[in-house]
Amino acid sequence: MRFRPLHDRVVVKRVESEQKTAGGIIIPDTAKEKPQEGEIIAVGSGARDESGKLIALDVKVGDRVLFGKWSGTEVKIDGVEYLIMKESDIMGVLEASSAAKAA
């Protein structure tokens, strides 16, 4: 099944965080918090301004984004958990450095 969000909504798949701390301590599942980082899976067509003109979204499919702890609505599509949120719930886009892109 394909899901297409409406207006200024986006579908985000959470990106799992590291299982270990920088010091090498393994974090058990019970102590983990849900990650606040994800990848954009689908985007809506955009919002409309007062005159009815369509305003495109700043994020696109494939972007890695940061969002608030309580942002979005959790849904399960084809057995996979996603978040549906408005673009305004996204705090920013993570951009890979040029060295990481080359590798």
Swiss-Prot record:
- What Gene Ontology terms describe where this protein resides (cellular component)? cytoplasm
- Record gene name: groES
A biological process (GO) of this protein is: chaperone cofactor-dependent protein refolding
Gene3D superfamilies xrefs: GroES chaperonin
UniProt lists the family membership as follows:
Belongs to the GroES chaperonin family.
Write down the species: Rhodospirillum centenum (strain ATCC 51521 / SW)
Protein name stated in the entry: Co-chaperonin GroES
Task: Assign the protein's first listed, main location to one coarse class.
Answer: cytoplasm
Assembly, in brief, is: Heptamer of 7 subunits arranged in a ring. Interacts with the chaperonin GroEL.
